[in-house]
């Protein structure tokens, strides 16, 4: 049966703001306390989804999570009605209100790790929501993520949505941002590639400036849970020096698709050995392996971090050629722009580059790859997905109108104290679940 890759992008939520919550994420820290535009952010992401759908890619949407998270604030000891809780947190612990209000669930590359049915022990698609335990504002996401995934992938004969791994530093899991899959064809068995920043129990190099968020132990646990064959699984350590330079996830320094890996020269520890293991295991599956390694002399790690060259989507078009989806910051960096011009002028796996304005997300450290969760589906599996989440002309129009109706065009950190923002968000999300056909997804609907 034929299979293709679908991308499920996160729809930016109404509380999108710049609180600078993510230590190790250079853009997040640099833009702390800036004025955000949630309406523009949501529309920028939606336009990317629509353009890719128009090009023939299977494109779905994942809804925002409810924010601010009143559950978190009440669990932390604040009581009273919603307005009273928000006022008390704003006065006593504004950093907790910022964490509870973050729209970071829009970066669905961190939502889960996904293994397609061709790779798993039981022939079903497996999802493990990421515990994201390194950051408070993200550690509160996984329960809602699991609920959302189960609403969309609700056929138990075809899909398994697990619980997140235990939320301990030893099992720190950041999802698909540290995972990719290589194969000759999407329907064929592939090699799954897990990248970690440190190991809890093994000796090895670690970053000194910024934390490594993904552990080897978490990656191995996900592979075991999904029933992946050891002969078709590769683990690699991310270069700790690039983590210290702001590469907080592997998808800021590398991206893969089918049999192609596009990465920076300094992406991994023992990089050539990583290539050799991937090539060897793919050869066993009768698949070729292509590496496009970007020299540090042409594009530095600093350029990669500011432009998000590697936080791109590498997609296979219906005609079999590959296209690289990059943020407009890549065209604004002269060295990165020159590299991309050369990349497509030579005969190689990547035939074209598409450029998108994702400025609102980029200012928080999220490019095209951050905004999407990849799910390989065969024809029957795709038909089993809740159909209301697929982007088409009708859904695009309804979502665009919904954004115009419900989203603010200006949100400063001080605005998070406004209890009306919670009311506005709940009204918007209640309508959204009806648009997408997802039922009572949120706590306030139950």
From Swiss-Prot:
Substrate binds at residues 19-28, 110, 137-138, 213, 251, 364. Pfam families: AstB (PF04996). SUPFAM superfamilies: Pentein. Keywords: Arginine metabolism, Hydrolase. The active site is at 174, 249, 370 (nucleophile). The keyword Hydrolase applies. It is an enzyme of class 3 (hydrolase). Pathway: Amino-acid degradation; L-arginine degradation via AST pathway; L-glutamate and succinate from L-arginine: step 2/5. Its EC number is 3.5.3.23. Homodimer. Belongs to the succinylarginine dihydrolase family. HAMAP family: AstB. This is N-succinylarginine dihydrolase. It comes from Paraburkholderia phytofirmans (strain DSM 17436 / LMG 22146 / PsJN). The lineage of its organism: Bacteria, Pseudomonadati, Pseudomonadota, Betaproteobacteria, Burkholderiales.
């Amino acid at each position: 049966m034929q299979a293709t890759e679908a991308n499920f992008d996160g729809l930016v939520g109404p509380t999108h703001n710049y609180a600078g919550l993510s230590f190790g994420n250079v853009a997040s820290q640099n833009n702390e306390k800036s004025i955000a535009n949630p309406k523009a952010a949501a529309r920028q992401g939606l336009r990317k989804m629509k353009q890719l759908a128009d090009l023939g890619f299977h494109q779905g949407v994942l809804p925002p999570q409810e924010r601010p998270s009143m559950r978190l604030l009440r669990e932390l000891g604040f009581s009273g009605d919603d307005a009273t809780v928000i006022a008390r947190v704003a006065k006593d612990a504004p950093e907790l209100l910022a964490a509870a209000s973050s729209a970071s669930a829009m970066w669905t590359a961190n939502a889960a790790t996904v293994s397609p049915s061709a790779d798993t022990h039981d022939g079903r698609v497996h999802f493990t929501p990421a515990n994201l335990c390194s950051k408070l504002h993200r550690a509160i996401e996984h329960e809602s993520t699991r609920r959302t995934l189960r609403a969309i992938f609700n056929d138990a004969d075809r899909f398994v949505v697990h619980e997140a791994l235990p939320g301990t530093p030893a099992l720190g899991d950041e999802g698909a941002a540290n995972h990719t899959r290589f194969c000759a064809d999407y329907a064929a068995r592939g090699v799954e590639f897990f990248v970690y920043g440190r190991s809890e129990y093994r000796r090895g190099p670690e970053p000194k400036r910024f934390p490594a968020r993904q552990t080897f132990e978490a990656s191995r646990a996900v592979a075991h849970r999904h029933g992946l064959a050891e002969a078709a699984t590769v683990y690699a350590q991310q270069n700790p020096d690039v983590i210290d330079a702001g590469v907080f996830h592997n998808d800021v320094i590398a991206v893969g698709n089918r049999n192609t890996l596009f990465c920076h020269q300094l992406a991994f520890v023992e990089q050539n050995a990583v290539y050799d293991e991937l090539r060897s295991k793919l050869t066993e599956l009768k698949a070729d392996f292509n590496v496009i390694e970007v020299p540090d002399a042409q594009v530095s790690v600093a350029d990669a971090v500011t432009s998000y060259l590697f936080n791109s989507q590498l997609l296979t078009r219906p005609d079999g050629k590959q296209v690289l989806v990059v943020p407009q910051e890549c065209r604004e960096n002269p060295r990165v722009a020159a590299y991309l011009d050369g990349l497509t002028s030579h005969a190689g796996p990547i035939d074209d580059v598409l450029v998108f304005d994702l400025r609102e997300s980029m200012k928080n450290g999220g490019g095209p790859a951050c905004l999407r969760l990849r799910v390989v589906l065969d024809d029957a599996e795709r038909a089993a997905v809740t159909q209301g989440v697929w982007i088409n002309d009708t859904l695009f129009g309804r979502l665009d109108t919904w954004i115009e109706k419900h989203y603010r065009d200006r949100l400063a950190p001080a605005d998070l104290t406004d209890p009306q923002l919670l009311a506005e968000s709940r009204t918007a999300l209640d309508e959204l679940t009806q648009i997408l056909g997802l039922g009572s997804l949120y706590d306030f609907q139950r």
